[in-house]
Amino acid sequence: MATLVELPDSVLLEIFSYLPVRDRIRISRVCHRWKRLVDDRWLWRHVDLTLYTMRPKVMWHLLRRYMASRLHSLRMGGYLFSGSQAPQLSPALLRALGQKCPNLKRLCLHVADLSMVPITSLPSTLRTLELHSCEISMAWLHKQQDPTVLPLLECIVLDRVPAFRDEHLQGLTRFRALRSLVLGGTYRVTETGLDAGLQELSYLQRLEVLGCTLSADSTLLAISRHLRDVRKIRLTVRGLSAPGLAVLEGMPALESLCLQGPLVTPEMPSPTEILSSCLTMPKLRVLELQGLGWEGQEAEKILCKGLPHCMVIVRACPKESMDWWM
């Protein structure tokens, strides 16, 4: 069996990539070879800092010493639930990310208070922005904001962002490159607001609406009216009926449809009704049913047999993470 000393650099780099950031830095003290490997650009393309309570001083050090132009994606947490005296993400730090990390494409922020951080301070190179349990101000996504902000943004994930409301949704229209939108637990968005917002976001190709107060029927109606080119839909089945699902019939570009439980409504379409609607979707290739309790049941057999051209996935909902920031 080969020892660590005998392993080639490429294998050691692969091993080091699975280590948390703190451990990567510690092992750089083992020997000159490991120090050189830890400094390799490849190892710092994707960085996850959500495991730590990261003080701004430490973050600045990481930014200057290790990340810089190497960084492609970054996950980091804030101090939203740590009290008013806790340090917060600053506009200066986010601006520095944009200046020192010109290759940064994806930024995921968790439990961060962004109410005093202008959206203009985010790196302009971002293609994906994820906000998980974050606070934002009313001005953050206001329609009258500078239209040149985040010109390359293609995907935005808003997961349990309590301040997000109809006005914010309509403000997303200034991101002309936006193609993917995920709304998770954004309970302030209304049916009227969703319809008005999607009317101006007709170029979206992927939409997920999960755990919101909106009924599935009203969501699908808005999609059928305004998102004729949508390719992927994922939504919670709360308030879904057979007539509501039928509004998707004939959707010309839809390739993937996911209906996510738990099953809580007697109006839920039967497997036969779901099959009937799916057969009218010419490009449908993936049908996923999550958390409906149909695994191994007759419903699964009906759908698999009736949709031979589709990948039919029937499974339980994945277990929710025990990590409070996820």
From Swiss-Prot:
The keyword Iron does not apply. Keywords: Leucine-rich repeat, Repeat, Ubl conjugation pathway. It comes from Homo sapiens (Human). Residues 1-47 form the F-box domain. Pathway: Protein modification; protein ubiquitination. Interacts with SKP1 and CUL1. Substrate-recognition component of the SCF (SKP1-CUL1-F-box protein)-type E3 ubiquitin ligase complex. Mediates the polyubiquitination and proteasomal degradation of CAMK1 leading to disruption of cyclin D1/CDK4 complex assembly which results in G1 cell cycle arrest in lung epithelia. This is F-box/LRR-repeat protein 12. Pfam families: F-box-like.
